[in-house]
Amino acid sequence: MGLNYNQEDFMGLDRFFQDAVSHNNTDANAASSIEVEMYECDCMYPTFAEIARRSGQPEIGAMFDAIAKEEGMHAQLLTKLYSELEVKDSAETLEAKRLVSTIESQIDAVASDSRGLRRALETALEVETIESQKTYPAFAKLAAEQGNMEVATAFEAIVKSETKHANWVKRALENLLEVA
């Protein structure tokens, strides 16, 4: 499969996050969150960091590494609150992992094309914006409505972190576009 930079999304990753499932159950939302945060920590952001480094942008690579680390911390926070929760990769996460593997297999081509890093940044911005403005605020609200204030507080903390990530990525994208 060749990369098609004219696609609306970056190898389908945008679609994965737009289609993220929200449940009417705080436990299910926590499981979904752990799954997605681990995917971002272990797969998506390390790949984006490598694209940045190979594109000659080590600062952006370091930013993606920092975001990956914090996404892992989000998963750990929720895992502590839900130590008994069984988390399995959904079909959507398995598909996203397959898409990242495709990107990794073509990483030299992606990194050598200026659109590759731009699309990685655009995807990251979209992901972090969805999480900070839609997904986690809704999860926090539902947890509070269901009387689970500890989990609501955790989701609210994640909102702040995801907002910070969105701001970092937005600045990096703006800076990249200025020099392009």
UniProtKB/Swiss-Prot annotation:
Function, as annotated: Exhibits oxidase-like and peroxidase-like activities in vitro.
Key word Signal present: no
Keywords: Cyanelle, Iron, Metal-binding, Plastid
Positions bound to Fe(3+) 1: 37, 40, 71, 131, 162
Compartments reported by the entry: Plastid, Cyanelle
Cofactor-binding details, from the entry: Binds 2 Fe(3+) ions per subunit. In the diferric oxidized state, His-74 does not coordinate iron but, in the reduced state, the iron 1 ion shifts by 2 Angstroms resulting in binding to His-74 and loss of the interactions with Glu-40 and Glu-131.
Cofactor names: Fe(3+)
Positions bearing the 3-(L-phenylalan-2'-yl)-L-valine (Phe-Val) cross-link: 17-127
Residues reported to bind Fe(3+) 2: 71, 128, 162, 165
Organism name: Cyanophora paradoxa
Additional information: The name 'symerythrin' reflects the protein's high level of internal symmetry.
Subunit structure: Monomer.
Predominant localisation class: plastid
Molecular function GO labels: ferric iron binding; oxidoreductase activity
Family annotation (InterPro entries): Ferritin-like (IPR012347), Ferritin-like_diiron (IPR009040), Ferritin-like_SF (IPR009078), Rbr2/Nigerythrin (IPR052753), Rr_diiron-bd_dom (IPR003251)
Ranges of residues in domain Ferritin-like diiron: 21-180
One GO cellular component term noted in the UniProt record for this chain: cyanelle
Family annotation (Pfam families): Rubrerythrin
Name of the molecule in the record: Symerythrin
